[in-house]
């Protein structure tokens, strides 16, 4: 029992009018003829309210509809009161237990075992109550306070403001909109007690007479005001008076607009802007040609980071473009020349890591650090840095200091770690404002300049022949509560963020403050934002970070809205199943297993782990791409290798077949389907369409493909063989059905010096060399915060490899050329890019299976057959791809009843005429195909004239 700090007599006085009745077996709450609050006197309101609030132990009460609230079930016979702790009028009503309606149990499955209570309030009364602090008090028969809970209100806000006609989710012009009269401002803030608008000039000084009171539309919860024409292109903020659970009091908060379209430096002020205005557009913006693809499966994605792309490029025409949007306007920088070469080979999509406004890079260049800044600037900005406590050369650059450190030492990681808070680097998964380009990538971050520069980048990529994909992060915000970079949670507290169902704490499973896209207005914000990027910035598709934390329905509805302005958009993302929403516990997720058949792509960890190896103990778990069975390292037993090998090979086969759930495999004299092959406790195959599957073996997360392999490779593998294993790993992605996703630099052996999570560790660990002279392997131990536990293993493998893991410029260039040839092979035939489940099942087969007569260890033989079904390739009737991951040249012999089937095949012309001298040793005989070690060879048979 919670002991009250005020006397029991006070409680008795409060409860004198309670009419107690016996509770039956149905465990209904004690009924009352009057509420506790009806007997309160005004002068006691504040003290009593404060006392109740001080005893609150959780936030387990959920107000779902105006007439229904739920609480965790209790065996105690208690009286529950919903109290509104408004100091002016302390109000309360008794809650009567009722059955939870089936439709609400289905809508809120994580609350389905809670007890429901009837709330006797009208819709208008409920709206008024939501503007105050709410608690539920539980009293026993002796009028003792047993429990006090705060109330979660997100669901009832949706019920009141989004489920009728012409309500909040149908308001089409939230934010600032320039119109004939001036500027319309609209902010959805249904729980706010008051909202006003403050305008600022270009110097961010408050404009005289620029504070305007806003009025609330009680039907929508939208506060609005019409300002004059002087507000056009002005900066602005909202002043919001709102009860905030973080402080448990009414706060007066100055906040930017969640629907901002332009911002000041460091996003401190929103700016009014019209994205149709010519001043926001580069020349010829409206007349540009946007590349298209015939089928979704024709896409090939190349994942870039705007700073990584050019920060290390020594061939820029202007050094100021380093790490900026402007670098994509270059014509002959090393990066642009490489992109042009990839485009010629068939690359058609540039995927940009987050480019919306983020909170973790200071946009004022004078206040952030660049790797080429001097130590003098370092010590001026952050004087407590350890290097500043020593004798140092003020003119020496950060880069040159890092270069002076021993590569096997800890100094580089220590310096980078100390400076990361102040440098100009971050991946960008720290959303501040969802619908404004990030300012740190612009030469001028203030106002419309960043908008123009972003559009120039998109326009230039389109002109190079690329579609542009944007990485978006609607699953969390950088901050919430009353923190400086909180926006949404200051306007409608505890609505936009997903809360723990009992504690009310903001869930953090994504990394940060999770958003609740199951809430209608959070889903609307996501959708409205996506439409702006697609319509006004001509973004051609979107990759969704931690998409599995969002409802499937919200994703489908967002795609429908984006398709209305861009019919050939494509959505894909991370469909991982984890956290508080795992296994559809709160809603049907946009996860791998749920999105089958939707043509929203999900990253496949199945093919990835088959190739890279899995597990946390990296050296103990090899993959097919780094020596499993055929180049076993000292940690892996022979039996483990054999067992892992057969499973990994079948997982890879399903991956090559688009990860289809229903793809048939003949295995051990029986036929199984893709969904029957295990991947841990889940099926390997889950896709119902090839567009459901994104294949990859490397991306920004985790170690690069090169670094991952060095962790796992046997020590005696030669440098040349390491490069071949690397390019063969990429071949699985490029020759698979589904859509390939390629990490920038993976084609030329990119390393991050073993760093598994480089999100905020600067240019030193994230460098890319498009001149192909260096892959930046082993440039210092990775930062301790991420990899200290791996340091002993890193030192062990570096010593064991004895330099065989160090590549030359020739290795880097050779890898890049082989990659381009494999990419060109993929794009040479639609047989690699089949567009339906039916066509894959018809045309794709594997000619050797584990435990079959045709099995040869180390060989995987895939046949793409255009002699069945509709013709998709005018050039080739059949393609056979042989992946030889063994250490020896091997021959695949066809079955005896098809002895002449190899006649008419030849090595693909691109490989015949390419730079890989090893693959050219592949041979075709009447009875089969001979392929060198560590080689992916493609054999083609020309299409018959009558086909």
Question: Residue locations for each model-derived region?
Answer:
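Substrate-binding/active-site clefts of carbohydrate-active enzymes
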Residues: 307-312, 316-319, 326, 341-348, ...
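C-terminal beta-strand-rich structural cap/linker in extracellular carbohydrate-active enzymes
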Residues: 189, 233-236, 921-947
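Loop/helix patches that line or flank the sugar-binding groove of alpha-linked glycan CAZymes
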Residues: 677-681, 685-880, 885-892, 899-901
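C-terminal motif of bacterial Sec signal peptides marking the signal peptidase cleavage site
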Residues: 20-22
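Bacterial signal peptide processing site
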Residues: 24-26
């Amino acid at each position: 029992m919670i002991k009250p700090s005020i006397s029991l007599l006070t409680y008795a006085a409060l409860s004198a009018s309670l009419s107690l009745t016996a509770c039956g077996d149905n465990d209904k709450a004690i009924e009352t003829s009057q509420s506790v609050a009806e007997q309160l006197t005004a002068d006691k309101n504040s003290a009593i309210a404060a006392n109740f609030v001080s005893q609150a132990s959780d936030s387990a009460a959920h107000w779902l509809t105006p007439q229904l609230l739920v609480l965790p079930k209790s065996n105690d016979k208690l009286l529950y009161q919903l109290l509104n702790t408004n100091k002016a009028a302390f109000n309360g009503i008794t809650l009567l237990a009722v059955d939870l309606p089936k439709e609400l149990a289905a809508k809120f499955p994580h609350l389905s075992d809670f007890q429901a209570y009837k709330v006797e309030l009208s819709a208008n009364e409920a709206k008024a109550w939501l503007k105050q602090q709410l608690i539920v008090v539980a009293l026993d028969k002796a009028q003792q306070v047993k429990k006090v809970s705060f109330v979660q209100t997100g669901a009832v806000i949706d019920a009141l403001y989004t489920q009728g006609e012409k309500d909040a989710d149908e308001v089409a012009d939230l934010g600032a909109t320039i119109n004939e009269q001036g500027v319309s401002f609209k902010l959805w803030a249904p729980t706010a007690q008051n909202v006003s608008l403050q305008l600022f000039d270009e110097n961010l000084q408050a404009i005289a007479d620029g504070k305007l009171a806003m009025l609330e539309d009680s039907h929508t919860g939208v506060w609005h005001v019409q300002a004059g024409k002087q507000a056009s292109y002005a900066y602005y903020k909202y002043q919001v008076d709102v009860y905030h659970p973080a402080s448990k009091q009414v706060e007066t908060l100055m906040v930017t607009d969640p629907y901002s379209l332009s911002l000041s430096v460091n996003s401190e002020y929103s700016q009014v802007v019209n994205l149709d205005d010519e001043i926001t557009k580069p020349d010829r913006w409206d007349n540009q040609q946007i590349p298209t693809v015939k089928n979704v499966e024709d896409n090939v994605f190349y994942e870039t980071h705007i700073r990584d792309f050019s920060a290390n490029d020594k061939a820029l025409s202007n050094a100021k473009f380093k790490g900026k949007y402007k670098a994509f306007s270059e014509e002959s920088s090393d990066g642009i020349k490489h992109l042009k070469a990839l485009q010629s080979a068939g690359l058609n999509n540039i995927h940009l890591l987050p480019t919306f406004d983020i909170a973790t890079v200071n946009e004022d260049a004078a206040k952030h650090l660049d790797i080429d800044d001097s130590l003098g600037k370092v010590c001026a900005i952050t004087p407590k840095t350890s290097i500043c406590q020593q004798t140092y050369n003020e003119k020496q650059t950060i880069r040159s200091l890092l270069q002076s450190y021993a590569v096997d030492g800890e100094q580089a990681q220590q310096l980078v770690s100390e400076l990361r808070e102040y440098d100009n680097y971050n991946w960008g998964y720290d959303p501040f404002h969802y619908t404004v380009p990030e300012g740190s990538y612009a030469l001028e971050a203030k106002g419309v300049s960043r908008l123009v520069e972003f559009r120039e980048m998109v326009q230039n990529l389109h002109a190079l022949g690329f579609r542009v994909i944007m990485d978006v992060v609607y699953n969390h915000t950088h901050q919430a509560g009353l923190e400086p970079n909180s926006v949404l949670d200051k306007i409608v507290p505890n609505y936009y963020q997903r809360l723990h169902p009992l504690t009310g704490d903001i869930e953090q499973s994504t990394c940060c403050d999770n958003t609740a896209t199951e809430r209608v207005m959070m889903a609307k914000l996501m959708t409205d934002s996506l439409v702006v990027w697609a319509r006004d910035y001509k973004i051609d598709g979107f990759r969704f970070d931690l998409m599995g934390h969002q409802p499937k329905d919200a994703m489908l509805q967002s795609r429908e809205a984006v398709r209305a302005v861009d019919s050939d958009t494509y959505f894909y993302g991370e469909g991982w199943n984890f956290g508080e929403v795992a296994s559809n516990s709160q809603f049907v997720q946009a996860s791998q297993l749920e999105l089958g058949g939707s043509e929203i792509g999900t990253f496949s960890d199945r093919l990835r782990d088959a190739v890279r190896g899995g597990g946390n103990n990296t050296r103990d778990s090899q993959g097919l791409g780094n020596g499993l069975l055929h180049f076993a390292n000292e940690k892996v037993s022979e039996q483990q290798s054999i067992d892992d090998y057969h499973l990994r090979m079948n997982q890879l086969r399903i991956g090559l077949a688009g990860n289809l759930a229903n793809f048939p495999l003949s295995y051990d004299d029986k036929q199984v389907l893709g969904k029957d092959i295990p991947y841990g406790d889940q099926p390997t195959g889950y896709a119902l369409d090839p567009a459901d599957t994104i294949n990859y073996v490397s991306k920004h997360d985790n170690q690069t493909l090169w670094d991952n392999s060095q962790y796992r490779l046997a020590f005696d593998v030669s440098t040349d063989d390491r490069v071949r294993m690397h390019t063969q790993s990429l071949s699985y992605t490029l020759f698979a059905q589904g859509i390939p996703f390629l990490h920038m630099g993976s084609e030329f052996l990119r390393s991050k010096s073993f760093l598994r999570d480089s999100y905020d560790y600067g240019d030193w660990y994230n460098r890319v060399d498009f001149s192909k002279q260096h892959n930046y392997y082993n440039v210092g131990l990775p930062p301790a915060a991420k990899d200290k536990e791996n340091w002993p293993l890193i030192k062990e493998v570096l010593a064991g490899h004895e330099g065989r893991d160090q590549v030359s410029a020739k290795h880097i260039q050779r890898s890049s050329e082989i990659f381009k040839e494999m990419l060109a092979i993929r794009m040479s035939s639609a047989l690699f890019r089949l567009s339906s489940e039916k066509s894959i099942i018809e045309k794709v087969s594997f000619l050797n299976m584990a435990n079959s007569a045709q099995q040869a260890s180390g060989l995987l033989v895939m046949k793409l057959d255009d002699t069945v079904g509709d013709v998709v390739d005018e050039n080739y009737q059949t393609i056979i791809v042989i992946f030889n991951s063994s250490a020896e040249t091997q021959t695949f012999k066809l079955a005896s009843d098809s002895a002449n089937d190899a006649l008419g095949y030849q090595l693909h012309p691109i490989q015949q005429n390419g730079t890989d001298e090893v693959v050219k040793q592949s041979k075709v005989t009447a009875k089969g195909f001979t392929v060198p070690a560590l080689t992916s060879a493609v054999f083609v048979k020309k299409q018959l004239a009558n086909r």
